[in-house]
From Swiss-Prot:
Annotated keywords: Glycoprotein, Membrane, Signal, Transmembrane, Transmembrane helix
Record's protein name: Integral membrane protein GPR180
Ranges that cross the membrane: 173-193, 202-222, 249-269, 284-304, 321-341, 360-380, 389-409
Organism the protein comes from: Homo sapiens
Main location: membrane
């Protein structure tokens, strides 16, 4: 596992993304940036309900009035049509097609976005009298610092909710998830610790599986802390959001290495038709090399996807090349491991061991295929629901997969009966020192 630790350190050093973009935005309105891009992009938000609110505070009113500073709000679909239109709209024509406009001539401005039949994404742009001019020198004027708060109506209809339509419900979900982890820890932590402490054939597998579970629990806790703060100020704790993503990726790497080492080790030993040695986890250089190579490949794709996606989620709808390659990799892994286990199952005569391999195959396939399947299913949902469906669905499916694997590895009766049949072919035997008797 030393290589895995080095990989985790490398991920920490190479990638520490920004947290989720807050809905309390701070920055500066820049005439230069607005002129270069024909409108400075400030942010986007998924408004819903009848009393959504955009609040902007500025200090330098004189500069704003002198520059004729304005904010332009475009619905996402309308803005996309403008960008893809073949009419070749000029800068001023594009800005004139904004659904909502706000002139900034006061310290604080409130704009109500109402009568929204369904949640919609709105893009906010800044522009002034210099934006559509060709003269660059006139735009070299003082920037305007601002604070912008984007709010949706809460359950009572008051604009106090910092969560966009695509984020609503995630705070409550992570609270329930942390609560479930806490209850499970209170019930099973002691017995699990005793099982790990005793050692035995499943010692290393249980350690790696428990480490992956702890990383997932840490990710859920970090997300809950971030969203709890986010619900109050619209910013949250970006460090905790980044920490949650890192924990999740580390957990994915742990589980991938575990499952690959087990499956590849069994397959290679079966191909050699060696009956004089037990099926060992990570027993051959070939299985180790294959596992490390695939883990490195997934890690590179995860890093690539995170750098390309500015929103930074642990799970994505896969609209870029890196995300598509991740889906292809996971499908290929599920198919290859499924085929390898199927070959083992078909030639296995022992009913108990065949049952073991079938259950393990279910856990593997569920772990690898849940993300691609949910990414495909999410297409039928609205844009604002897709990331939420994938995030919640993947976490629940992978949790079920870990429960299946835990029950399998901790099944005393199954391993006792299998070991009594033949300790030489006992699945998951770590070393020859454990051949003499089963350990639980």
């Amino acid at each position: 596992m030393g290589g895995l630790r080095l990989l985790a350190v490398a991920l920490t050093c190479c990638w520490w993304p920004q947290g989720s973009q807050g809905k309390t935005l701070r920055g500066s309105f820049s005439s230069t940036a607005a002129q270069d891009a024909q409108g400075q992009r400030i942010g986007h938000f998924e408004f819903h309900g009848d009393h959504a609110l955009l609040c902007v505070r500025i200090n330098n009113i004189a500069v704003a009035v002198g520059k004729e500073a304005k904010l332009y709000l475009f619905q996402a679909q309308e803005w996309l049509k403008l960008q893809q239109s073949s009419h070749g709209y000029s800068c001023s024509e594009k800005l004139s097609k904004a659904q909502l406009t706000m002139t900034m001539n006061q310290t604080e401005h409130n704009l109500t976005v109402s009568q929204i039949p369904s949640p919609q994404t709105w893009h906010v742009f800044y522009a002034d009298k210099y934006t559509c001019q060709d003269d660059k020198e006139n735009s070299q004027v003082e920037d305007i610092p601002f604070e912008m708060v984007l709010l949706n109506p809460d359950a009572e209809g008051n604009p106090f909710d910092h969560f966009s339509a695509g984020e609503s419900g995630l705070h409550e979900f992570f609270f329930l998830l942390v609560l479930v982890y806490f209850v499970i820890a209170c019930i099973y932590a002691q017995s699990l610790w005793q099982a790990i402490k005793k050692g035995g054939p499943m010692h290393m597998i249980l350690k790696v599986l428990t480490t992956a579970l702890l990383l997932q629990a840490g990710s859920a806790l970090a997300n809950y802390i971030h969203f709890s703060s986010y619900s109050k100020d619209g910013i949250g704790v970006p460090f905790m959001g980044s920490l949650a993503e890192f924990f999740d990726i580390a957990s994915q790497i742990q589980m991938l290495y575990l499952l690959l080492s087990l499956c590849m080790g069994w397959t290679i030993v079966r191909m050699k038709k060696s009956q004089s040695r037990p099926l060992q986890w990570d027993s051959t250089p070939a299985s180790t090399g294959i596992a490390v190579f695939i883990v490195m490949t997934q890690s590179v794709l995860l890093l690539w996807e995170q750098f390309e996606d500015i929103s930074h989620h642990s799970y994505h709808s896969h609209h870029n090349l890196a995300g598509i390659l991740l889906i292809v990799l996971r499908i290929c892994l599920a198919l290859s491991l499924g085929c390898g286990l199927y070959q083992i199952i078909t030639v296995e005569r022992s009913t108990l061991k065949r049952e073991f391999y079938i259950t393990f195959a279910k856990g593997c396939i569920l772990w690898f295929l849940c993300h691609p399947v949910l990414a495909c299913i999410s297409v039928i949902f609205s844009d604002y629901q897709r990331d939420k469906v994938i995030t919640i669905g993947v976490i629940l499916c992978q949790s079920v997969s870990m429960v299946i694997l835990y029950r399998l590895f901790l099944s005393h009766s199954l391993y006792w009966e299998v070991s009594s049949l033949s300790s030489v072919t006992l699945p998951l035997t770590i070393s020859s020192g454990h051949k003499s008797r089963p350990h639980f």
